[in-house]
Amino acid sequence: MIDPTLRGAYRPGQLTVHHDPAVLGSVAKALRGVGRTVALVPTMGALHQGHLQIVRQAKRTNQVVIVSIFVNPLQFGAGEDLDKYPRTLDADVELLRAEGVELVFAPNAEQMYPDGPRTTVHPGPLGAELEGASRPTHFAGMLTVVAKLLQIARPHQAFFGEKDYQQLTLIRQMVRDLNFDVRIVAVPTVRESDGLALSSRNRYLDAAQRETALALSAALSAGAHAGGLGAEGVLAAARAVLDATPGLDLDYLELRSSTLGPAPASGNARLLVAAKVGTTRLIDNIAVTLGAPIDGHPNLDSQPEPAGTDPALLPPAR
């Protein structure tokens, strides 16, 4: 039984919103104390079907799911869209209620950083590459808030989408390097029927810009299908699509290993792209298998495991 002093702070089958980190932490601790497993889905709100798919995957593991909604000022640099970032808490809560979520954590900046951002997490060299090259403070801010959320909720598992693949990779790195007692679960990118990756920033695109944005997923798909041609073939196939698309301001197109080191000669790799369409910056990525037998069929020995067989989807014993 949960501590009577927390009565009303957690109501099975009903959604409760908490703003105070101490209260949310106490509720999560009490749930763990009675043998419940806890899952965390961190978000910045403005929820869409991509977020909800992550929530659904978390719920399928039969855990108490905590969804955090916090627009983290630390991960926005000078001239970025912190003030413009959509804040739709009431609508987000209703979406989560419909998904059967029981706990929402929605603090403000003063509650998360009562003394300001005095202590932060440095992302290491990878934090200065790809997204970090143009957003030098972004990943330190992101890792700092994720570290705080993990400390507050102490979840058994935390769920993140693969769309922000560099973010996912850095979170895994932080958890491993700093010995966080949590399992990170990756959820595949959710796409529209035409291939566009779901993003809170898609709402900034007009109809013509949205059509232009489709080149990102088309380029990634072309690159992935050229895996048998090696790294140069993958990049050439993807770049041909991007170069043929007017109105696209390419930031980077890179092929890396699955941990974002140098791309291997064969096996699992990741193709990543970032570009501006109008004033909206979009990112996307896709898994690529490099190398194929002479007959052109994919090398099945180097294929990644299907997401459904990921042992991380099984609640850990604690």
Swiss-Prot record:
It holds the Pfam family Pantoate_ligase. The keyword Calcium does not apply. It is found in: Cytoplasm. Gene3D superfamilies: HUPs, Pantoate-beta-alanine ligase, C-terminal domain. One of its GO terms (molecular function) is ATP binding. Coiled coil: none annotated. ATP binds at residues 44-51, 161-164, 190, 198-201. The active site is at residue 51. Pathway: Cofactor biosynthesis; (R)-pantothenate biosynthesis; (R)-pantothenate from (R)-pantoate and beta-alanine: step 1/1. (R)-pantoate binds at residues 75, 167. It comes from the Bacteria. Keywords: ATP-binding, Cytoplasm, Ligase, Nucleotide-binding, Pantothenate biosynthesis. Residues 295-318 are annotated as: Disordered. The keyword Thylakoid does not apply. Its EC number is 6.3.2.1. Homodimer. The reaction proceeds by a bi uni uni bi ping pong mechanism. HAMAP family: PanC. Belongs to the pantothenate synthetase family. This is Pantothenate synthetase. It comes from Nocardia farcinica (strain IFM 10152). The lineage of its organism: Bacteria, Bacillati, Actinomycetota, Actinomycetes, Mycobacteriales. The gene is panC.
